[in-house]
Design a protein with these regions (language model features):
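A short, polar/charged loop-to-alpha-helix boundary motif
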Residues: 82-99
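CN hydrolase (nitrilase-like) catalytic-core segments centered on the catalytic cysteine
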Residues: 1-85
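Generic detector of leucine side chains in alpha-helical contexts
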Residues: 6, 74-77, 90-92, 105, ...
């Protein structure tokens, strides 16, 4: 069967002197890629991120931990500025449904993957 839930523990943030627009763009990109793991694999994703500041104050961690279902739907989103503990109930039977009705990875062409293991595609 494989994994039933994907967990991504992280400690990602930004320099405190970085502009707010860039900060938001980076957080949104991180959330998008994490949610895409749920879609690609058809299983819930739990992305946990550190919150607060590094001891020297030079880095602020995003917080914003979240949980999705197997289609990447946001089920829970934590605060960006305080520690939280949340229990989120997940229906693991949904994963079978998502995998059967939208088999995202079924149609991949793994026979075409070999070239990415080479530094240069024309290398023999």
């Amino acid at each position: 069967m494989g994994a039933e839930i994907l967990f991504y523990p992280t400690a990602i943030g930004w320099a405190t002197d970085q502009d707010e627009e860039t900060n938001k763009d980076q957080y949104n990109a991180w959330q998008t890629i994490q949610r895409s793991h749920a879609v690609a694999n058809g299983v819930p994703v739990v992305s946990v991120n550190r919150v607060g500041f590094e001891q020297n104050g030079a880095m602020k961690f995003w917080g914003g931990s979240f949980v999705t279902n197997g289609q990447g739907k946001l089920l829970y989103l934590a605060s960006h500025d305080k520690e939280e503990i949340e229990v989120v109930e997940l229906d693991l039977n949904e994963s079978d449904y998502f995998r059967k009705h939208w088999p995202f990875l079924r149609d991949r062409r793994i026979e075409t993957y070999a070239p990415i293991t080479k530094r240069f595609i024309d290398e023999d």
